[in-house]
Regions:
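Glycine-centered secondary-structure boundary/capping sites
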Residues: 78-79, 100-104
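Core of compact, soluble alpha-helical bundle domains
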Residues: 1-70, 102-150
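Active-site flanking loop/helix segments enriched in acidic
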Residues: 71-75
Length: 150
């Protein structure tokens, strides 16, 4: 099991450029998005964070800061948070495809897939949660201003 994790991390590190290139071909990026370059940087950063998580160098709480950063960027860009979810799932699919190339045994595969799911579920949950907290603040501020001037 540890060997599968090690090989997966090694493959992702050595093939990072190819991985990101494949991912970029499938993600949603709006032309008007002021953070469109950040999307790729965030993806690269998350790939690195994922490999650190698999190697148990970081825990899930440590990705919450990047979740907040991404939520703020999506809010500022005025794009639907669903695009982030879609792009994240495309990255997850790319990692799963890489795992299957390693041909792990059933039990090894199950354990690694559980870790992959946990990482991405945590990332998506905290990003969407942060996004909606920001939206709630924005809407509250809007109505407060509206009351003030009406």
């Amino acid at each position: 099991m540890e060997a599968t994790k090690r090989y997966l991390c090694l493959y992702l590190k050595e093939s990072q450029e190819k991985f990101i290139s494949n991912w970029k071909k499938r993600i949603l990026v709006h032309e008007h998005d002021p953070y469109k370059d950040e999307i790729i940087k965030n993806g690269t950063h998350l790939l690195h964070a994922f490999t650190m998580y698999i190697r148990e160098e970081i825990n899930l709480q440590e990705i919450e800061n990047i979740s907040k950063k991404i939520a703020q960027e999506r809010m500022d860009a005025k794009v639907n948070i669903a695009d982030f979810i879609y792009n994240t799932n495309e990255g997850k699919k790319e990692i799963l495809n890489t795992l299957f190339l390693l041909n792990p045994t059933g039990q090894e595969c199950k354990v690694v897939i559980e870790q992959i799911n946990l990482f991405f579920d945590h990332l998506i949950y905290h990003t969407v949660y942060s996004y909606y907290e920001l939206r709630k603040e924005y809407i509250h501020s809007y109505y407060e201003l509206k009351k003030k001037y009406n």
